[in-house]
């Protein structure tokens, strides 16, 4: 069970605020201390999952860190849907994975933007005949 801090008790915060506070504490401190940056960890997981899917189904499935974060959100939704009883940590984990997914998407968008700017700045011809 996730414990409520004394500050949270004193401030009479809402459940949604407490959920986000705990998720933030877990994702931004506890998790990083144990596993490192989520995106780095999810990149490794994506390689394992892609290799498994390729081996099992004989198809190349490109996965990235964002895919792992999204699938972990779905995993948590499945847990919530089939749980015999309410467990708050499922919702806290769900919020944490959603935050990680957002960070992965933002980082990917930044890389795409930087590449696009470089192509435009250097007038690189990326038509199929020149690639």
Can you say where each PLM-predicted feature lies in the sequence?
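Intrinsically disordered, low-complexity regulatory regions
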Residues: 1-131
């Amino acid at each position: 069970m996730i414990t409520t801090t004394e500050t949270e008790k004193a401030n009479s915060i809402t459940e949604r605020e407490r959920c986000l506070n705990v998720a933030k504490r877990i994702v931004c401190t506890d998790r990083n201390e144990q596993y490192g940056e989520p995106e780095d960890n999810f990149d490794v997981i994506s390689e394992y999952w892609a290799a498994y899917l390729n081996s099992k189904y004989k198809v190349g499935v490109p996965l990235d860190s964002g895919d792992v974060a999204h699938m972990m959100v779905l995993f948590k939704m499945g847990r919530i849907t089939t749980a015999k009883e309410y467990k708050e940590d499922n919702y806290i984990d769900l919020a944490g994975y959603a935050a990680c997914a957002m960070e992965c998407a933002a980082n990917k968008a930044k890389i795409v933007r930087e590449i696009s700017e470089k192509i435009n700045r250097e007038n690189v011809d990326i038509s199929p005949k020149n690639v």
